[in-house]
Amino acid sequence: MTTDERMIAFGRRVREVRKAKGISQERLAEMAGIDRSYMGNIERGEKNITLKKAYEICDALEIEIQDLV
């Protein structure tokens, strides 16, 4: 799997979990301390985020990092 494929898969998983929990993209971005447009880029696999940001998203979703990879 390429890096781009991993970023896309990660973003899809973030979106799946967010929607399953009934959280809007805007609300998740706010909870994770991320700009809403940046969160959209993450969900579309357009941003190669830091591990710190990944953990902030996980904390906001109340899940473990392995749930997204």
What are the roles of these predicted feature ranges?
Residues 1-9:
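A detector for short, charged/polar N-terminal pre-domain segments
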Residues 46-56, 65:
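Short, basic-rich loop-to-helix N-cap that marks the start of a DNA-contacting helix
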Residues 12-31, 56:
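Short basic helix-loop element that most often maps to the first helix and adjoining turn
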Residues 14, 28-29, 39-42, 68:
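Conserved hydrophobic/aromatic packing and binding residues within compact polymer-binding modules
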Residues 62-69:
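Short C-terminal boundary/hinge segments that cap the last helix of small helical domains
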Residues 33-47:
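Recognition helix of helix-turn-helix/homeodomain-like DNA-binding domains
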Residues 8, 19-20, 48:
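Short amphipathic helical patch at the helix-1/turn junction of helix-turn-helix
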